[in-house]
Amino acid sequence: MEQQHGILVLNKPKGLSSAQCVARVKRLGQKKIGHAGTLDPMATGVLLVLLGNATKLSGYLLEGGVKTYGGTLRLGVTTDTWDAEGSIVSETALSEDDLARGSALEQAARREVEAWLDVTEQPVPPYSAAKHQGQPLYKLARAGKEVPVKVKSIHVSHASVQWVNMPDVRFRVTCSSGSYIRSLAHSLGIRLGCGATLTELTREYSHPFGLDVAHTLDEILAEPERLPEWIMPISAALPGWKNISVGKVQEAHLKNGMPVPHLPEFGTFESGERALILAQDGSPLALAEARMDRERPVWAVLRGLFTH
């Protein structure tokens, strides 16, 4: 199959890493391929697979892109990875009173989930791809070396409890890109004093795509000839960006890395605004940003997207 260009919204299965999923799609003749927003092997749900010129979108898709997750955490258990994939570090025996419906512990857990709305910083899990002096933290952890505590800024815009079946708490959370849900679960366990670990996680939405447009890996591998019809165009991945169609002269400028002067037919112009530049046939040419060049409004190339 020839190289495709665009975004394949994959419903990642449990047990495979994001890289393993990408490798399987790559076997369908897709040499230029990548993904935006890694999911841990135990997690399922929306994984954006970038094909062809869409591989250049990765940083822009993650920029300010919110994600929604549905997950389950278990009270009374702590693991070294902060999720069910790890080894148990400690267990707290919960009493019958703790496990009773409507118990004080259940009510406290509900409050703590809702308190995620106030979280602005979180510790990075020791078993993660975050780096310290060029070394991934998980490599330090696996080698038994001391893992430095790293903290990252996050934003949570929604947090709610879906159901409770003690000691399991089902939740939904919408947060900024790069947030660690297992860190939220781990910190909740610390605050409650009984420990907690993430046991299940599904990414339901990764801006701007949800599970409603996702395809399973089995579906894709079973009917590879349908891959072209399942691919979302680059314009669909950048809903907040202006679309600008240019003529042959401007297209030549773009392909040489030159800025395109703003024209009235492009619509409004605001410095710092970003746009997807399209050829007359609708094919993507570049990602561009509105700038002033010697008092002249231009669209400067951020990334070229043309394929020839």
Task: Show which residues each predicted segment covers.
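RNA pseudouridine synthases
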Residues: 1-183, 187-213, 287
